[in-house]
A protein has these predicted regions:
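Sec-dependent signal peptide recognition
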Residues: 2-9
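Post-signal-peptide N-terminal segment of Sec-exported extracytoplasmic proteins
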Residues: 35-64
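C-terminal partner/receptor-binding element of secreted or periplasmic proteins
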Residues: 121-164
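C-terminal motif of bacterial Sec signal peptides marking the signal peptidase cleavage site
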Residues: 13-15
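Short, conserved beta-turn/loop elements at beta-strand boundaries and strand-helix junctions
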Residues: 93-103
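Bacterial signal peptide processing site
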Residues: 17-20
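Short coil-to-beta-strand transition motifs
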Residues: 77-92
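N-terminal post-signal-peptidase region of extra-cytosolic proteins
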Residues: 67-79
């Protein structure tokens, strides 16, 4: 066995690793521990619903939203009608993923679940942002989520320490 190739193979494998970034417009950005999501104004949960839907920076309904464009839903435990007042929620976990809606029609659902905690007792569960596409599409980035949420919500990410 030729041992000359071990350093070369090691270098190639290490270069495949993606670095964590602090830029929410990049696909490699992950919402860091210690982040928060601020609700900036009253959010209305409709009658007989446990969520509010947002798209293009505005409240919408499940019937009116375009599943092929990025949309978000803010989920709570109890049924509306209900008004959620401005509050800062702690983000305790995020999950990014994709799943087949229809393999025959080649439709994928790209999603990010942002699990939330309230210090004020609000019965919040999570914020889910999602869009449908096909296998030639890419997942969305956090900055696109911010645009979809408009002025209703704001993410705050903790300051990161510079690399030493």
């Amino acid at each position: 066995m030729n041992l000359k190739f071990i350093p070369v193979v090691s270098l190639v494998l290490c270069s495949c690793q993606t670095a964590q970034t602090t830029d929410p417009s990049l696909l490699t950005f992950k919402i860091p521990d210690g982040s928060t999501l601020s609700l900036n104004k009253n959010l209305e949960i409709p009658d007989n619903k446990t969520h509010a839907a947002l798209q293009y920076g505005e409240l919408t309904t499940d019937r009116k939203k375009d599943d092929y464009k990025l949309n978000c839903r803010f989920d709570i435990k109890s049924f509306g009608p209900k008004t959620i007042k401005p509050e800062v929620f702690k983000i305790h976990r995020t999950v990014d993923g994709q799943e087949w809606i229809s393999e025959e029609a080649n439709i994928l659902r790209f999603y990010t679940d942002v699990f939330l905690q309230s210090d004020k007792g609000t019965d919040v569960i999570k914020l889910t942002c999602q869009e449908q596409g096909d296998n030639s599409d890419r997942a969305f980035v956090v900055s696109e989520m911010e645009t979809t949420l408009g002025d209703y919500f704001t993410f705050t990410f903790p300051a990161t320490k510079p690399a030493e």
